[in-house]
Amino acid sequence: MKTFSPTPKDINRQWFVVDAQDQVLGRLASQIAHRLRGKHKPEFAPHMDNGDFIVVVNCEKIKVTGNKLADKKYYRHSGWVGGLKTTILGDVLADKPSRALMAAVKGMLPKNRLGRAMLKKLKIYAGPEHPHTAQNPQPLTLPH
């Protein structure tokens, strides 16, 4: 019996829509990253992008546990001396809630070209509407 190695023609991608209302940020992000990577499929290969497309709606109603709204910090640097910028999670969720979920999922994917390609299959929207109805995304229920 030979070992099966998938090829690009073997990839069958589906579209799923996930409702993020009352979901915990980290738990939701780990399940989304799992699906984006394709680890739920029997033909998973770590060197290929065979994950599905995920559309997340109601991102503005996402939950966090503990004191993370005040304690968790996001850092970015301008490249200049003294150019370190710090933002807390509460401000990020108030300003652009999709950015917090995107950062959480990005941290759970590979840090290379393949991970960037996987992240392009994630579509996040703050409200309940999304423009991907033509792809006929199937509702995906994730445990709380």
Curated annotation (Swiss-Prot):
One of its GO terms (biological process) is negative regulation of translation. Signal peptide: none annotated. Pfam families: Ribosomal_L13 (PF00572). GO terms for molecular function: mRNA binding; structural constituent of ribosome. The keyword Ribonucleoprotein applies. It comes from the Bacteria. One of its GO terms (cellular component) is cytosolic large ribosomal subunit. Gene3D superfamilies: Ribosomal protein L13. InterPro entries: Ribosomal_uL13, Ribosomal_uL13_bac-type, Ribosomal_uL13_CS, Ribosomal_uL13_sf. Keywords: Ribonucleoprotein, Ribosomal protein. Transmembrane segments: none annotated. HAMAP family: Ribosomal_uL13. Belongs to the universal ribosomal protein uL13 family. Part of the 50S ribosomal subunit. This protein is one of the early assembly proteins of the 50S ribosomal subunit, although it is not seen to bind rRNA by itself. It is important during the early stages of 50S assembly. This is Large ribosomal subunit protein uL13.
